[in-house]
Design a protein with these regions (language model features):
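Short glycine-rich anion-binding loops that position phosphate/pyrophosphate groups of nucleotides
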Residues: 17, 107-110, 169, 258
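A conserved beta-strand/loop element that lines the FAD pocket in flavoprotein oxidoreductases
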Residues: 68-83, 219-234
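FAD-binding core/adjacent interface of flavoenzyme oxidoreductases
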Residues: 1-6, 71-157, 186, 253
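Well-ordered beta-strand scaffold positions
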Residues: 87, 94-95, 230, 237, ...
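Predominantly flavin-linked oxidoreductase catalytic cores and closely associated redox partners
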Residues: 120-217, 221, 225-227
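Short hydrophobic core segments
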Residues: 10-12, 97-108, 231, 239, ...
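Beta1-alpha1 glycine-rich phosphate/pyrophosphate-binding loop at the start
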Residues: 2-75, 80, 166-206, 253
Length: 258
């Protein structure tokens, strides 16, 4: 197809969806990808960054590297307006990109389901920055715990029993059983890890057999799995439930709605 007659496609977002769409369309169209960052974050491995299993640069990859040799153009910036009549999108750099087709692949943000305190007291799992915040907070709390030689305990709660929450709870348990216990066994033995799920089972999108196996494995790792446990409010050092006693939580990781 001659270049002059190839449709112009602008894709907003350089995540998995945006980049895959760009590569699929590049053969028959002139494609431009727009993202506010010039790197892509491999979200499924953020839990490893949160628990010191991986360095941050292991889950971040340059967008231009992913597009090298494809003929796809890249612009770093954020869209501030779309003119549907004239088929153009304006970026915060003041650049205007014209298109025949516009693909919006901007991803999603964490849903708090209207639960009070999530923003103030919960730590999300959507970016490297958030993953590093979780790591720093867990380690800070562990160092605080290390000062005590009595029965003072540290509780870390993960809210959300989907894949992200299950992986996070398991990784925290491995961190506790491995590096932290090797550094200071007394403190590690006084850490409690909770996985809280509002529904009747964790990993509800998978088979009941797989859910049961995952819950069993978490129990073996020392994770307290709480199903049928709906959260009413997140406070600074505890989680208020819709029913039952509050759950202590010096650190709350919000993996619900991720």
């Amino acid at each position: 197809m001659p270049s002059s007659t190839r449709p112009r496609v602008v894709i907003l977002g350089a995540g998995f969806g945006g980049l895959n769409a760009a590569k699929a369309l590049a053969k028959d169209a002139d494609v431009t990808v727009v993202d506010r960052h010039n790197f892509q974050t491999f979200l499924p491995l953020l839990y490893q960054v949160s628990t010191a299993g991986l360095a941050a640069d292991h889950v971040v990859h340059p967008v231009r590297g992913a597009l090298r040799g494809t003929g796809i153009k890249f612009r770093m910036g954020s869209p501030i307006s779309v003119d549907h009549k004239n088929k153009s999108v304006k970026l915060d750099s003041s650049e205007v990109l014209e298109f025949d087709h516009l693909v919006v692949a901007l991803g999603s943000s964490t849903a708090d389901f209207g639960v009070p305190g999530v923003t103030e007291h919960g730590l999300g799992m959507k970016s490297v920055h958030e993953a590093l915040m979780i790591r720093a907070e867990v380690m800070r709390r562990f160092e605080d715990l290390a000062r005590f030689e009595d029965d003072t305990r540290l509780s870390i709660a993960v809210v959300g029993g989907g894949p992200t929450g299950v992986e996070m709870a398991g990784a925290l348990a491995e961190l506790k059983r491995g590096p932290l216990k090797n550094d200071l066994a007394h403190a590690a033995n006084h850490m409690d890890i909770y996985l809280i799920e509002a529904g009747p089972r964790i990993l509800p999108m998978f088979s009941e057999k797989l859910s049961a196996r995952a819950e069993s494995d978490l129990h073996k790792l020392g994770v307290f799995v709480k199903t049928n446990t709906a959260v009413r409010e997140i406070q600074s050092r505890k989680i208020i439930l819709k029913e039952g006693e509050p759950i202590p939580a010096e650190v709350t990781v919000w993996a619900a709605g991720v």
